[in-house]
Amino acid sequence: MLRLASGADLAFAAQAARFGDDAMTVQLIVTDEGATRVITLRRPEKKNAITQDMYRAMSAAIDTAQNNPAIRCLIITGGSGVFTAGNDLEDFLSDGTSNTGTARSANNAIKFLYSLAHNVKPIIAAVDGVAIGIGTTMLFHCDYVLASTTATFSTPFIHLGLVPEGASSLLMPHTMGYQRAFAMLVMGRTFSAEDAQVAGFVNVVVSPGHTEAEAKKVAREICKLPAEAVAISRRLIRLPPEDMTRRIDQESHLFGERMRSKEAVAAFKAFFSRKKA
């Protein structure tokens, strides 16, 4: 079930979806607090692993903010203790694969990434705890990232026989340099909050349990600035959205090919075997 603020857009409300087997379980909460839209992943029992429905709802939350002048800023958070473990792999693979070999559910993740790439509103991430896979790559689409001292960042695509996604092969080297991007994307190195701040993709490190509150302070600061000047300046300093979506498409094609590879099949088999053990 999706919980909406009372003033949320009708178009967004129309896209609200029920999540999970238990209709009372809220897996995504979207609230409009003043001029800020807060998108909260709320699936702690699965470390906020993202399902197809959650991707669709996050895309809707971002897309409906674009032409809403009342929304000046966006925040993505996982609440206290965990940001997200990335894709829910069982859900990701449950819909089968397309003729390119990509999981059909990947289309929902790609739509979410497109929403991030085309987003024109400042977006802040509040990361408390683990950020795995797309939980890390989505941060490179954000304008400001806060992390707790216990936050960790990892992209274990290679260990699953796969390749980078989310335009991370473009954005990571652009943000933190080739060598650091290689260490994270190819070698699968985990970055601490301090590592991430030194690398340049985390702005501020705060105490655990305080990332969301601090993110809201940053949002209020941004919302006080002249909106048009912010939008123009943001557009000037970001990579063009067309570059990002082009790279998302390239990565997705290669990702689909890799899904059919012997390496990926063996890696997924081993992953689920460990999970059942």
Regions found by a protein language model. Name each.
Residues 111-118, 126, 132-186, 199, ...:
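CoA-thioester-processing core
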Residues 78-118, 131, 243:
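Glycine- (often His-adjacent) and acidic-residue-rich active-site loop
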